[in-house]
From Swiss-Prot:
Belongs to the NusB family. Pfam families: NusB (PF01029). The keyword RNA-binding applies. SUPFAM superfamilies: NusB-like. The keyword Transcription regulation applies. Keywords: RNA-binding, Transcription, Transcription antitermination, Transcription regulation. It comes from the Bacteria. One of its GO terms (molecular function) is RNA binding. This is Transcription antitermination protein NusB.
Amino acid sequence: MSTVNPSVAKRSAARLAAVQVLYQMEMTGADTERALQDAKDRRAAEPKGRMADPDNSLLNQVVRGVSAQLEDIDGHVGRALSGDWTVERLEAVLRAIVRAGAWELSARPQTPARVCISEWVDVAHAFYSGPEPGLVNGVLDHLAQTLRGGEMGKGA
């Protein structure tokens, strides 16, 4: 039986929490710092051991990064969507996932692209049991090839 590295679990928890914060921001109009503080307060009120504590640095980076670069991120995501799909047409949680994944691919080269894609697909599986994780995979793979072509084995 294998065990999960605690730092990996913390980063995974941070990605999941980031989606929740981004969703809250979109649904309530809360600003970035308020939404991050609300998330911290909710975690403090939860029983310990229920979930891995998130890597707060990564959580803050993702939420602040997506917030600060939303227009650019939406442009990248929009170009990666197929057909007549638009970022606005995506359901809010799905939109938060692809935005966060797109930000990480563009802003955190220390995370290998394939790891980044896999992590965000795992986050999608936490919310969806249908085709949505496949959409996340397709969009992020397209973005990885565009943003990190050499790493993905294809030219940009």
